Amino acid sequence: MIPLQKDNQEEGVCPICQESLKEAVSTNCGHLFCRVCLTQHVEKASASGVFCCPLCRKPCSEEVLGTGYICPNHQKRVCRFCEESRLLLCVECLVSPEHMSHHELTIENALSHYKERLNRRSRKLRKDIAELQRLKAQQEKKLQALQFQVDHGNHRLEAGPESQHQTREQLGALPQQWLGQLEHMPAEAARILDISRAVTQLRSLVIDLERTAKELDTNTLKNAGDLLNRSAPQKLEVIYPQLEKGVSELLLQPPQKL
């Protein structure tokens, strides 16, 4: 067998067959091979139960084989990630006018950087979800209390005056008072429904963030920025003032004496 060449990786040459890489794939140590060549190597190594990189002999796992990347423009191995264009670049791309003023990271640093950003965003959204759920429970409780007060007021109206100081004229004015408050309930209930929908969408976004962070590699690195820029359905600081302006102003008032 021809000795593996260690200096041909940047030129897009497979160290096993010594030809141009075809469907380039890489071991987890980052060396590139033709898919067919590496597959054959893995099949032979499987018999012994030990799989090592054909080039550097570092132990590898068959399950962590990932797609390698060759620059489609220059047929050289990519080595940097451009944050502006979100593209993987080779050494020739780096000196091109298109990318010279851009900020690039090594692929290893980019993976670490974006994984931390994904996890940080996920943690922040989980806190937002918890706060939204707290507000939702708080508003539901207040709405239930208002409904109870209205029902209780109607019951006392039907029962008649409890004392000489509480005339039927006074009691007769109560339904209009409760009806005025009840007019606000559908709109506030709709806001609570909006919170429920926002929580559902935020949970979906958190799942995507955590899955991408866990599986982040060169295959998914280009999509990490798009995911980080995905807007939450509605900012917590927007929803909360709506609640405070509506339901809270109405329900934080002292209970009316009947």
Swiss-Prot record:
Keywords assigned: Coiled coil, Metal-binding, Transferase, Ubl conjugation pathway, Zinc, Zinc-finger
One MF annotation (Gene Ontology) recorded for this entry: zinc ion binding
Coiled coil residues, start to end: 107-159
GO biological process: innate immune response; negative regulation of cell growth; negative regulation of NF-kappaB transcription factor activity; negative regulation of non-canonical NF-kappaB signal transduction; negative regulation of protein catabolic process; negative regulation of protein localization to nucleus; protein neddylation
InterPro entries: TRIM/RBCC, Znf_B-box, Znf_C3HC4_RING-type, Znf_RING, Znf_RING/FYVE/PHD, Znf_RING_CS
Zinc finger (RING-type): 14-56
Residues that hold Zn(2+) according to the record: C71, H74, C93, H99
One Pfam family this sequence matches: zf-C3HC4
Ranges annotated as B box-type zinc finger: 66-107
SUPFAM superfamilies documented for this protein: B-box zinc-binding domain (SSF57845), RING/U-box (SSF57850)
Reaction equations catalysed: S-ubiquitinyl-[E2 ubiquitin-conjugating enzyme]-L-cysteine + [acceptor protein]-L-lysine = [E2 ubiquitin-conjugating enzyme]-L-cysteine + N(6)-ubiquitinyl-[acceptor protein]-L-lysine
Tissue specificity of this protein: Highly expressed in normal gastrointestinal epithelia but that is down-regulated in gastrointestinal carcinomas and chronic inflammatory lesions of the gastrointestinal tract.
EC number: 2.3.2.27
Entry's Gene Ontology cellular component terms: cytoplasm; IkappaB kinase complex
Family: Belongs to the TRIM/RBCC family.
Biological role stated in the UniProt entry: E3 ubiquitin-protein ligase that plays a role in the limitation of the innate immune response. Mediates inhibition of the RLR signaling pathway by ubiquitinating RIGI and IFIH1 receptors, leading to their proteasomal degradation. Also promotes the neddylation of IKBKG/NEMO, stabilizing NFKBIA, and thereby inhibiting of NF-kappa-B nuclear translocation and activation.
Subunit structure: Interacts with NEDD8.
Protein name: E3 ubiquitin ligase TRIM40
Organism: Homo sapiens (Human)
Underlying gene: TRIM40
